[in-house]
Amino acid sequence: MPFVERVFSGVQPTGNLHLGNYLGAIVNFVKMQETHNCIYCVVDMHAITQGVDVWGGPVELARNTREVTAAFIASGIDPKKHIVFNQSQVSGHAELAWIFNCVARMGWLGRMTQFKEKAGKDRENASVGLFDYPVLMAADILLYRATHVPVGEDQKQHLELSRDIAQKFNNDFGDSIRAQGTNDGLFFPLPEPFITGPATRVMSLRDGTKKMSKSDASDNSRINLTDDADTIAQKIRKAKTDPEPLPTEEKGLEARPEADNLVGIFAALADRSKADVLRDFGGGQFSSFKNALAELCVTKLAPIAGEMKRLVADPGHIDAILNEGSDRARAIADETMKLSKDIVGFIRRR
């Protein structure tokens, strides 16, 4: 019996969502809901794996969780057709993560490059949660026996670990799984990356060699999803460029990071190729191109900012969406945990 095709997407509530988050992830989340059964999770348990100085404390975490939810809804995700919830409301995430902690090997986690990057040189003071982050991510995905996960370059290694954990669980408990009569001895699927086409990598508006980031000291380096129309237009017009005209061919963007970034943003927002954009603007000055880009950004993003502002002003409404979504998520998760506990040999309440 094949697994039900299901896509699991998670976003950390780290605050200050920006254009990079929108074009790199949220746009694709909106597109895939038209063709797939989707679960959208605000992964607030992952958010606290680093120090409180990073995630901001309880008040900030709650505010950021609601802001991510508002961004989902304002961008077009339908919480009635698909599941939108926050991770901490479903205890199965933590329960399954513990089982997976006993399946995963230390050597597997020791090879995870993101831990090394986030912990830096002071690894002895990093939290166990940060080291164990990939195991919780595997539990997030497999709790819903999701078959596909949209991942960026920085998460591909973690998805591979999820597959390894699923495979080892299936092997370690094969006899018990077969006794349950489940999928020819396979309880968990091996989740595949969800491919939506080339991802848009959005760079800083002040330095085209660096990713757009919420942690950049300059607010002019990014377009926040909460920026109003005037602020968006002003940031685009102040964006760093070089003195040369725009090239007429895509190859001419090489070694011109700021030009490449702005053309890429235009292409992504207009759903066109860079070559197509350059056919319209190649050979011209940046001033006229920036005016067109500012207008496009305002057209696409200002309505999202307005709707986010409206939603965030009513936290009770957002909480109701998360509560309803968590009830639907829990119905799936509870069935997975019931069977997982039976397979492992845990005695559970009946």
From Swiss-Prot:
Top-level EC class as recorded in UniProt: ligase
Motif ('HIGH' region) on chain: 13-21
Cited InterPro entries: aa-tRNA-synth_I_CS (IPR001412), aa-tRNA-synth_Ic (IPR002305), Rossmann-like_a/b/a_fold (IPR014729), Trp-tRNA-ligase (IPR002306), Trp-tRNA-ligase_bac-type (IPR024109), Trp-tRNA_synthetase (IPR050203)
Source domain of life: Bacteria
Keyword Cytoplasm in record: yes
TM ranges: none
Motif 'KMSKS' region per UniProt: ranges: 211-215
Record has Protein biosynthesis as a keyword: yes
Listed EC numbers: 6.1.1.2
Key words of the record: Aminoacyl-tRNA synthetase, ATP-binding, Cytoplasm, Ligase, Nucleotide-binding, Protein biosynthesis
Gene Ontology cellular component annotations, sorted alphabetically: cytosol
Swiss-Prot/TrEMBL GO biological process terms: tryptophanyl-tRNA aminoacylation
Residues the record lists as binding L-tryptophan: D140
Residues involved in ATP binding: Q12, P13, T14, G20, N21, G152, E153, D154, V202, K211, M212, S213, K214, S215
UniProt cross-references to PROSITE patterns, sorted A to Z: AA_TRNA_LIGASE_I
Gene Ontology MF: a single term: ATP binding
Catalytic activity: tRNA(Trp) + L-tryptophan + ATP = L-tryptophyl-tRNA(Trp) + AMP + diphosphate + H(+)
Protein localization: Cytoplasm
Function: Catalyzes the attachment of tryptophan to tRNA(Trp).
Matches recorded under NCBIfam families: trpS
Family: Belongs to the class-I aminoacyl-tRNA synthetase family.
Subunit structure: Homodimer.
Protein's name in the database: Tryptophan--tRNA ligase
Organism: Bradyrhizobium diazoefficiens (strain JCM 10833 / BCRC 13528 / IAM 13628 / NBRC 14792 / USDA 110)
Classification of source organism: Bacteria, Pseudomonadati, Pseudomonadota, Alphaproteobacteria, Hyphomicrobiales
